[in-house]
């Protein structure tokens, strides 16, 4: 497992800037088989593997040559790109992002972790992601691009960042005389609980509940400006039911996230 990085070093000329620390949930993606192309793919790693929410299978380039992923977004608002489970953390490898063929994220290295690039809102017709300098053919399991859901209330205290919510299933071995020999890790994931209070009735119903109802995996950043590395690719586990907290209709809700980081 590894940490995640949010890129906040980009300010676009159009749209509304992020205030900074509202939690971001990237759950809707514009990238589909109908509007996405890539320079190359393999029989075992087709483009379609990257365009669903399973982290078990990859898109894989057929060579180490420069690869360009092109998504025709048709003028729909975009403010984030999410990449989960990949091999892009290679020496010399860079990615570049362009909106309508204008560079918005200059060539930059990628670290070995879930990546969420948060941007100012824009409405490009075409988004391109160029991968150059690979020493090993590029692989990506999940690619999302779209408009992130920004939480109405910031999270301040009582929250476990997903990167620190380690859940480990392991077997510890001991000798007959009680000496520690070693351990076998059977499974390792991340988890956290999200608790939101005093949500306005309209915001909950119009903005948050569609995500709760969809129950699809998402990119999650709890406090993007202060803790940019604390991001995961997560899904809801168990019940997620809102309650009416006040006579004015204010709502509250808690749910558990399970995921990878």
Predicted regions and their residues:
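Short, surface-exposed beta-strand/strand-loop-strand elements in extracellular ectodomains
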Residues: 90-101
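Extracellular/virion structural assembly segments
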Residues: 1-67, 74-92, 106-124, 130-261
